Amino acid sequence: MTEDKITGTLVFAVLTAVLGSFQFGYDIGVINAPQQVIITHYRHVLGVPLDDRKAINSYAINSTEELPTGPYPGDPTPTSWAEEETTASASLIIMLWSLSVSIFAIGGMIASFFGGMLGDRLGRIKAMLVANILSLVGALLMWFSKLGPSHILIISGRGISGLYCGLISGLVPMYIGEIAPTKFRGAIGALHQLAIVTGILVSQIIGLDFLLGNHELWHILLGLSAVPAVLQSLMLFFCPESPRYLYIKLDEEAKARKSLKKLRGSDDVTKDITEMRKEREEASSEKKVSIIQLFTNSSYRQPILVALMLHMAQQFSGINGIFYYSTSIFQTAGISQPVYATIGVGAINTIFTALSVFLVEKAGRRSLFLIGMSGMFVCAIFMSVGLVLLDKLPWMSYVSMTAIFLFVSFFEIGPGPIPWFMVAEFFSQGPRPAALAMAAFSNWTCNFIIALCFQYIADFCGPYVFFLFAGVVLVFTLFTFFKVPETKGKSFEEIAAEFQKKSGSAQSPKAAVEMEFLGATETV
């Protein structure tokens, strides 16, 4: 029996898979930098005069958005929307832009239910190939959006790309988790999130106006995700299928052994086969649980509600408001080069995501989540204070910028990765697929709400917007302190007992029997 090791085939397969995660991140971040360029093009398509500089500048400042990056001479002069164009046309532009951002999350929300199903039906490799069809269609629609009704093509392309990302957000972690050696499963699994934030960072860099984020090349920037989609599709033909899928789902032991020999670089795969045989026996003795049963069964109700709250905390903390509209926020904060500050956010996001890979296995999940949320609360307060006092104290722009950087850092320490870890640890094999699907749906739904509403909230609240998010973060921090148990190193039985304790009720005999049936002696 050989020790777990990293082989060339394993590295190739993992890097191929996380190209999908990279596309996911690229699609999240790509819409930010060319924001005003795209809005200007929308105005052109809808017949609003492009030389109406005052209205453009008023829109950029009053809605906290980036000033135009196009070749407009002179200094911006803020004026009222009402003086330059009708309320209806102004609302239409805002609605179309918000929809361009948020339709991505609608696609992800819908597709998040079907990633696991597609992977089980077609296999992990074929499922990722099929998903890439959606990625290519979405990218091509956006690539050619400059030639037609741009608002329709961009919104359609973003929606289809969202469908792709909803599928891939389940398929990639599933595949790399199943091919990874036990010793490296945690680190390899974390590469999914690392590839996402790397994709965000790359989209921010090449979205600079002197690269692709300008009036001539913005459509290429949006459609560039077609490149990793084509590359991944070609590379997938050389990747071995998941041995767990072959053995546990299809009962193809010979094919599973062949796949394992390639991945492990050894003819001795007894250890993996034994582990998979045990997993298959456990899975066959455990009934599957539907999404409805998660809420109707008393054994699952408290864990699933806490799981949903953790994902709501992640999204409603305001983090995606920063990711989607960071350039606008820095513009409002008085930063002279807001796009570069946005890239700084992406770089910090990447660095602290890598750091969290090590922290999450050393410290408790609940502790890191509380530290992250508490830090975000303080940063949100300083962010708003900086924005409110900016007119009187210009140096407050640096306070706001520093607060944003720290806000992102605290997010990646705890609320970013932790909910996904904890949801998997709340549930054993039977209810886990339904719980993860419900958690993914909740995450995408909240993502959509923030993407659609953040701009309207920012318009209404002005510089006080992050006071609102500070209040939300405080509520979720208190909820975590009183209701969320620590899961690191505990069995499902111990976690279930913690939930009963925090809900203030003793475990019923029926619930105890159910938890025993669900394999409550397993340690996470």
Curated annotation (Swiss-Prot):
It comes from the Eukaryota. D-glucose and maltose competitively inhibit fructose transport. D-glucose, D-fructose and maltose inhibit deoxyglucose transport. Pfam families: Sugar_tr. D-glucose binds at residues 193, 314-315, 320, 349, 412, 420. Residues 1-6, 116-126, 177-187, 240-303, 361-366, 414-433, 483-524 are cytoplasmic. The keyword Cell wall biogenesis/degradation does not apply. InterPro entries: Glc_transpt_2, GLUT, MFS_dom, MFS_sugar_transport-like, MFS_trans_sf, Sugar/inositol_transpt, Sugar_transporter_CS. One of its GO terms (molecular function) is dehydroascorbic acid transmembrane transporter activity. Residues 27-89, 146-150, 212-216, 328-338, 390-394, 459-463 are extracellular. One of its GO terms (biological process) is D-glucose transmembrane transport. N-glycosylated; required for stability and retention at the cell surface of pancreatic beta cells. Its main location: membrane. GO terms for cellular component: brush border; plasma membrane. The chain crosses the membrane at residues 7-26, 90-115, 127-145, 151-176, 188-211, 217-239, 304-327, 339-360, 367-389, 395-413, 434-458, 464-482. It catalyses: D-glucose(out) = D-glucose(in); D-fructose(out) = D-fructose(in); L-dehydroascorbate(out) = L-dehydroascorbate(in); D-galactose(in) = D-galactose(out). It is found in: Cell membrane. The keyword Transmembrane applies. The modification Phosphothreonine is found at residue 523. Facilitative hexose transporter that mediates the transport of glucose, fructose and galactose. Likely mediates the bidirectional transfer of glucose across the plasma membrane of hepatocytes and is responsible for uptake of glucose by the beta cells; may comprise part of the glucose-sensing mechanism of the beta cell. May also participate with the Na(+)/glucose cotransporter in the transcellular transport of glucose in the small intestine and kidney. Also able to mediate the transport of dehydroascorbate. Belongs to the major facilitator superfamily. Sugar transporter (TC 2.A.1.1) family. Glucose transporter subfamily. This is Solute carrier family 2, facilitated glucose transporter member 2. The gene is SLC2A2.
